[in-house]
């Protein structure tokens, strides 16, 4: 049996358990993918002491960085927020090597330490069976029914050294892209995990240096190639950034997520390099892309994250996602300066030959290429749907002749305002309403074309849902030519636009009462 061996509680217990339960020889396989907190030689020797007939460590750091993490960088790897997928990205590589070593060693079975409640069983077994449909797989944690306490007791009973204790029951998954912590208080979202006891590679943010550090990353076609001007292989660059970011407490995340199997859980993640790189990459990518490209790429990145998290590394659809992502990253070249301090990484400067940023256009500098006078028309069209949607609040035009009629309709107008009617009024009516404390918008006469808002414009654009147009009594008050003209146009446009129009005080009162009754009934 080829056992994917991490040296932790689960795989150490099962190395002994497989020998006893299956009477099988065990080859312990540890893959070096840049573990930050583990001594892999110590782990190899431990496997031999526990009875493995062979224990090997495969150096796959460059393969992991260049063929797996690289895809994640281009896709701004994340799942449901700030989990940068350190474990899911690594699992296909582990499964691939397990199948490969099993073939080399003549083993027909591989084993892993995943539980039946987790996602890793899907990622490892799905990949292994895709690569070799005939491989046998055993998952002792699913079979033996032991919890963490029982495992620690089993380890004590059989003399298996483990670092977990009752007071520190935490388990870890570790690679260069991040460290995942589980167990203890982490599993209960109601508790605050004691970071001082849990963190493996990051300083506590509050204990990190008070002075910020500027990290300059150079990117070529979406991938970082240099730190502060020094060219590096991707694996070495990631490991170097882990030290820088870890010192400043960058990348510590309490993350509640939805597992593939349907459970909602919390993990505690440390991913200093991932946090810095993705912050830089995302900002550079945004800088060289159009708005439409950025919007679509964000959607693709989410799909990428869900696909990897769910264990579908070899799904054909995943190839299509990567094809688009690779194409989009062809122009993502340049340098980004990232400021790191006390748990925070923030891109603060970007330079690239591929930018579509134009300083004169984007700033307050003078420019003949951008016609600012075109903005008014653009805004009117751009906000059309929003403005139309807000017209669900009805509008009413009030043009009421004689003070006597205005006084008679004061309560009626108050009622319209309470029903959220937006009130527009011609000059004398507006003046009366202002004195009575009723809010209304002044509408200028048709003859005053230069003054806005103008009555004719609003009638032409069918802006009113109700018109109360009560002319002055010719026997009591002389009517001007402008009033006669405006009144005539109002009535004509009301008929043309099929707008409710009232020309008498009593009808106006009755109509508003009916509107109130209908509103209450509704």
Predicted segments with their positions:
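Short, acidic/small-residue loops that bind anionic groups at enzyme active sites
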Residues: 113-116, 131-144, 487-509
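Nucleotide-activated chemistry modules centered on ATP-dependent adenylation/adenylyltransferase
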Residues: 1-4, 9-392
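Structural alpha-beta junctions
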Residues: 52, 132-136, 243-247, 416-423, ...
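ATP-dependent carboxylate/acyl-activation modules
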Residues: 390-473, 480-500, 508-521
